Structures are given as structure tokens and as C-alpha cells.
Amino acid sequence: MEEMDDFTVRRGEREDITGAAGPPEERPLDPAAFEEDDEPTLRPRTLDEFVGQERLKENLRIFVEAAKQRGEPLDHMLLAGPPGLGKTSLCRILAAEMGVQLHPTSGPSLERAGDMAAILTSLEEGDFLFIDEIHRLNRQIEEVLYPAMEDFAIDIVLGQGPSARTIRMDLPRFTLVGATTRTGLMTKPLLDRFGFSARLDYYEPHELEKIVVRNARILGVPITEGGARQLARRSRGTPRVANRLLKRVRDYAQVVGDGTIDEETANAALEMQGVDHLGLDRTDREYLSLIIEKFDGGPVGVGTLSVALGEARDTVEDVYEPYLLQSGLIQRTSRGRVATRHAYAHLGFPVRDGG
């Protein structure tokens, strides 16, 4: 088998895909890598300010108004979709609309049943409990959530051994909002306890243009229609990516240009970041080139690809692949990943026979 460190992508870019130790390269297009970097001022504060996801927003408006009229908390809801599409922002908005407190946490941070019980007993009437990456909850935590979601109560075990007894503690009515990138990893009993489930879609370019223009105004950055259009086109259908790129292009315009983000400035800055006209970065192109050059276009298993890229399998499946699939650059088959004709053309490779 050929050594992986002999692999080279097109256009003379040398790629280290051995996973060797070294400082990790920042990916400007990784929507999962910089949620905490989002400036609070850029977050929409109301459903009217939230751009895109129109059908979902209309449903949520109705749910909020109906719950207010009845004086009840919102039903538990599950928001699914790739990272960076606004699941956390929507939860913040809904909590504000209902006039209640938001208590955020994440699946990986909840290790023991006691952790979950402590959070649940701290909630007040109507509060929102937001669990990001809810698909990563362990079974013990889920067992605590079942009665909490269904009956607004938790079972507490007192004592040990034969003398142990269980008491039920009532909880205030609350709303659990779960966010996930991997609905398929969630258990059916947990899924069944959500009264409403929705999947957030990638954004259209015109929606991202609105987001870029709005946030450029908030940041005090002059931007032309052409500049906003280029940023939107290369943001992978993801608002969080658009915000990250806007900040990087702002820096470039300030230092190299006259401070205004026009089409030429945006193009130059994004090319410097390694972001091409489809919104692919160096790692995306490495992924596609690996399938095409090393594995004859596929099929190749995601486990093999993750090892070759030096990335965790979950990262490849949750971060890299969704946009490549959405863009028609790869296909998932029962035997593995396959590069499409579109991928060959984009990277400048001749399409193989039957490809």
C-alpha cells in the first residue's frame, strides 16, 4: 500500500494527511469550531430578526402565542440539523418570547444522574432547559429525563441496599429543547417524548446576503452588494460561517484596502483564506482529492477517510460531509463515500470511465 505522506492534491498544494502531531490548522469554515466566538450583538433577538427558516418560524410563532394564551409552557421540542444554522439562537429567542430563563447545557457535560437532577430541581415554572448535542446523553441521564419530561417529576433513591426506597419529587413545568446533529443516534424513548421536532435547513444565498448586510451594519463595516454576495456564496449555507468570514474579510479590508468590503476585496480576502467559489476550504478539497486520487473515486469507508485525514470520525460525518452531500460533491452508498462528476470537475480531474 502506498504511503499516505506521498499524497499530493492538485495545484501543487502539499497535504499532510498522516494525522501526525502538530498544531491544528484553524478552519475558517468549520461551523462547529467557534460557537463561543460568536459576538452576542450579532445574534438575532426576535423571530422577526431571525433570517431564514420561514416555515419553522411561522410554526414557532403559533406555538408561542397559543402557549401564552393558555398560560402553559411550550411543549418539549427537538431542533435538528448541521452545526451553525441557528438552533441555539432560536432557543434563546423562544425563551425571551415566553419571558422565562434559559438554562443551557450539553450532552457530553452531563455525566451522572445527579448532574441532571441538580439542574432539573433548579428550574422555575416555564423555564427552558437547552441541551446541545442531546444525542450524546448517556443512558443514566435519559432515565432521569423520561419522568421529568412526561410527568414533571423525578425519582430519587434514598438509602442503599435492601433498605433503599424511592420517592418522587415534583418539578415545575418546564420546556426541554434538545439540539442535535445526529437524530439517528437518539433512542426512540427519548425521541417520543418531544412534542415537536424540526430540522433546520441550509440557508439560501439571498438569505445569507441579508444576514451579512445586517451584521456588517452592526459591526460598522461598509459593504457593497457585490461584497455581500461573495461572502454569502462562500459561506456553505451557514450563518455562523458567514459571520466568521465577515470578520476575516473586515480585517483584510481594513489593512489592505480602504475599509470597504466590495466584491474585489471579498474575493481577494477569501482566496487568501483558502475558500473557493463553492465555499470549500483546504480540508474539503483534501477530502475530495483523497477519494479521487487514492481510492479511484470511491467507494471508501468513512473510517478510512477519517484516519487518512487525521480527524475524528464524528467530525468528518458531522462537519465536513453534510455540505459536500448538499452540494452534490459526494454520495453516500452502502459501501462508502463516492466522489461525483461535480467533484471531479471542481478539482480539475478528468472524470473516470463510468464516473
UniProtKB/Swiss-Prot annotation:
UniProt cross-references to InterPro entries, sorted A to Z: AAA+_ATPase, AAA_lid_4, DNA_helicase_Holl-junc_RuvB, P-loop_NTPase, RuvB-like_N, RuvB_C, WH-like_DNA-bd_sf, WH_DNA-bd_sf
Stored Pfam families: AAA_lid_4, RuvB_C, RuvB_N
Region of interest (Head domain (RuvB-H)), residue spans: 277-355
EC number: 3.6.4.-
Biased composition (Basic and acidic residues): 7-17
Localization annotation: Cytoplasm
Family: Belongs to the RuvB family.
Assembly, per entry: Homohexamer. Forms an RuvA(8)-RuvB(12)-Holliday junction (HJ) complex. HJ DNA is sandwiched between 2 RuvA tetramers; dsDNA enters through RuvA and exits via RuvB. An RuvB hexamer assembles on each DNA strand where it exits the tetramer. Each RuvB hexamer is contacted by two RuvA subunits (via domain III) on 2 adjacent RuvB subunits; this complex drives branch migration. In the full resolvosome a probable DNA-RuvA(4)-RuvB(12)-RuvC(2) complex forms which resolves the HJ.
Protein name per the record: Holliday junction branch migration complex subunit RuvB
Organism: Rubrobacter xylanophilus (strain DSM 9941 / JCM 11954 / NBRC 16129 / PRD-1)
